[in-house]
C-alpha cells in the first residue's frame, strides 16, 4: 500500500526531475525503518542514469522537500536508478514490454482468481490486458494489481 504522502512527494519531485532531463520512476516511503527512508528512483531519458544525475536530483529535491515540510521528522533520502526492475509500473514499461510474458497478481480476487500469466497486450485506465491461450483477458485495476516479468 502506498504511503499517503507519496502523491505529494511525486508532485514535488516530477517537475524537478523534468528540469534535469530525468523521469521519476518510483517513490517509496519506508516508515518501518528508523529513521524512515524515502527512496526515489529516477531515470535519465537520454542516456544511462549516472551518479551525477542522482546527485543533482538529490540536492535539488532535498532543498524543496525541506522547504515544503511534507515530512516533519528526521528521514533518510535515497535517490537511485531503478536498473531493470522485474515490476512494470509506468506507461513506458507497459509499452516497452507489450507482447512479453508477464505475471499479474491481485490484492483481491477477480472472478475467483488472484494470479494470471500471459502475454501482455496493454493497459488503460480500466484494466491490464493479457493474452492467455489465445484469448484476451481484462483484469480490472480496481482489484489492486502487481505486474511483473516472470523469474
Curated annotation (Swiss-Prot):
**Would you say which domain of life the source belongs to?**
Bacteria
Cellular component terms (Gene Ontology): cytosol
The protein's predominant localisation is cytoplasm
Gene Ontology terms: biological process: ribosomal small subunit assembly; translation
Q: Which UniProt keywords apply?
A: Cytoplasm, Ribosome biogenesis
The subcellular location is: Cytoplasm
User: What function is annotated for this protein?
Assistant: Required for maturation of 30S ribosomal subunits.
Q: What is this protein called?
A: Ribosome maturation factor RimP
Protein source organism: Synechocystis sp. (strain ATCC 27184 / PCC 6803 / Kazusa)
